Amino acid sequence: MNMPMPTREVLTKPYLDQKSGTAGLRKKVAVFQQPHYLENFLQSVFDCVPELRGKTLVLGGDGRYHNRAAIQTAIAMAAANGAQRVIVGQGGLLSTPAASHLIRKYHAAGGFIFTASHNPAGPDGDFGIKFNIANGGQASEGLTDRIYAHSKVLTRYHIIDGSYVDLDRRGLQLLGSLEIEIVDCVDEYAALMQQLFDFDLMREWFR
């Protein structure tokens, strides 16, 4: 039997600039690397979306600088905040359409997608995060407003210390009572496309 790992409550001070737009929260990498910055935003979501407790969460991003570190933080906080399972794209990679598909396929309560779209990447570039809800779509304006309001008064967050997940190894891993499944997002999305399109027929068109 896998024993639960101890969680730690970390005292923090709110940041006043964590208002998400339609594409999520986008800032310079250096902003996200400030102490507690990402953790504050994640905790605000966990606090404002209590249905994430005991449910499945999807995680992944576009692979830009800081992606892997952010995913490790999100996993540690998901475990501390009572999520039952997380589905993660292998290597931490997951496009927005693929994440939306996985949220629906695995009946997840939501998902965190780490992307800044076409914005420049790298240590001096941009980073971003957005929360998608259980239908795979983006969070409503009402929800993002509640998350923002909560982020301005947040005083603590919950996390598991010393956790590490091998993002490159497909299959099931455990972090305390949290199940972590690393999936091949290309295979998953290709299977969806094969359901939607008749590729054999399309192949005939091009002959």
Predicted regions, residues:
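Phosphate/oxyanion-binding active-site loops and adjacent basic polyanion-contact surfaces
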Residues: Q33-F46, H66-N67, S95, E181-L192
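Generic, well-ordered alpha-helical scaffold segments in large soluble proteins
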Residues: S44-C48, M77, L102, H150, ...
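Bulky hydrophobic/aromatic "packing anchor" residues in well-ordered structure
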Residues: A23-L25, A99, I147, M193
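Short strand-loop junctions, especially beta-strand C-caps/beta-turns
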Residues: L25, A30, G60-R64, A134, ...
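Ferredoxin-reductase
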Residues: L52-Q138
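Glycine-rich phosphate/diphosphate-binding loops that line cofactor/substrate pockets in enzymes
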Residues: F41-L57, L196-F206
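Positively charged, low-complexity intrinsically disordered leader regions
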Residues: M1-L42
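Gly/Ser/Thr-enriched, mixed-charge loops and adjacent short helices
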Residues: P6-Y15, H36, G125-R207
